Regions:
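Single conserved hydrophobic/aromatic residue that forms the stacking wall/gate
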Residues: 225-237
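Short acidic (Asp/Glu) patches
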Residues: 69-71, 223-224, 228
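ATP-binding N-lobe of GHMP and related small-molecule kinases
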Residues: 2-157, 161, 165-182, 187, ...
């Protein structure tokens, strides 16, 4: 979608039904301002990009069974309406550039997807996600992205899993026609965190961020039951 078209849709209520599935009614107007600001900041960073895609991925909270995912236990948890949003423009430069609000921009070359020993930041997460997609046969040629998040780091609602879900959802939607399901998206995020970032996390955080809603998860056989309607990570436009 062209940037101006996106802005017009936000202003005229074209995305209100989508926003209503993500945010509380009283928050929709402030969220519109947040999305408009994100697009403006993206435009300032990448002025030559005019076709954009916009994504949202939620944080999560656990209700019961925290940490038992490591022992193949059962968890009740839910996605929250605090999320990370990403504005992306896809291209064929074989590089991923990401600028997150409050952090320096980083770049990941798609010609070098090996683990970088000692590099444990967001760049390694993105490198691991891209590597896993390539292992699965998905051809990626690059994108530029600006992200802003109210899933605060260190707040206990999985800012890293939300970021992983955002990146994997963007890649899957554009380069793979949304063919990878929510469970596989979660596994890709866990793979990047385990083998590239170096954190031996379980799968609960990524699963809840990816499948959305209020959910019962059985990690013995990796099954799930939605207790409420899911609010999946989504492509806004």
């Amino acid at each position: 979608m062209k940037i101006q078209d996106f802005q017009d849709n936000v202003t005229c209520g074209g995305f209100d039904n989508i926003f209503a599935n993500i945010y509380k009614p009283q928050d929709i107007e402030s969220q519109k301002s947040r999305y408009m600001s994100a697009v403006e900041k993206f435009t300032a960073l990448y002025p030559n990009r005019n076709d954009i895609h916009v994504y949202s991925a939620p944080g999560r909270t656990e209700i019961g069974g925290n940490h038992t995912d490591h022992q193949h236990g059962c968890v009740i948890a839910g996605a929250v309406d605090l999320d990370v949003i990403g504005v992306a423009a896809f291209h064929h430069e074989n590089i991923i550039r990401i600028k997150s609000e409050g952090y320096d921009e980083f770049a990941v070359s798609l010609d070098d997807l090996d683990v970088h020993i000692g590099e444990k930041g967001s760049s390694e997460i993105v490198r691991g996600i891209a590597a896993r997609f390539k292992d699965l046969g998905v051809e990626i040629s690059g994108f530029d992205m600006y992200t802003t998040s109210n899933v605060l780091a260190g707040s206990g609602i999985s800012s890293s899993a939300a970021f992983e879900t955002l990146i994997a959802t963007a890649i899957d939607s554009y380069y793979n026609n949304n063919q990878i399901g929510a469970v596989e998206i979660a596994k890709i995020g866990q793979y990047a965190e385990n083998f590239y970032f170096g954190k031996k996390s379980g799968l609960m955080d990524q699963m809840v961020c990816s499948v959305g809603g209020f959910v019962f998860l059985d990690f013995q056989n990796l099954s799930l039951i939605h207790i409420s309607e899911p609010t999946r990570p989504r492509l806004i436009s």
